[in-house]
């Protein structure tokens, strides 16, 4: 236990917060072949593999995911939200942060309705998260 005098001389340091999606905070300088600090809310990438994965213990399903090589040359696993998708190898996608709690190693989401990813068909509620246009009545 430090004395008050010791705390006056050197106060307690608060822990620095680690990013939940560290890959989005890296840029890549292809001329110098080195990484740079470049924070961005989303990054563009190309699908290298599209498949399904089984979730952790209490849950049971086949969750859709894509292996994506981002514009900073890092490969990640990204979750494909919604029912049905049109992604295949070499599709260009937009990736945002946000983990999937029951899929180990999946810390990113693919943005529906952006670039090569289509929106979810027939969706009427919560459309903005799934890139669905307003239906004509």
Swiss-Prot record:
One of its GO terms (molecular function) is structural constituent of ribosome. GO terms for biological process: translation. The modification 3-methylthioaspartic acid is found at residue 102. Keywords: Methylation, Ribonucleoprotein, Ribosomal protein, RNA-binding, rRNA-binding, tRNA-binding. It holds the Pfam family Ribosom_S12_S23. The keyword Methyltransferase does not apply. NCBIfam families: rpsL_bact. Part of the 30S ribosomal subunit. Contacts proteins S8 and S17. May interact with IF1 in the 30S initiation complex. This is Small ribosomal subunit protein uS12.
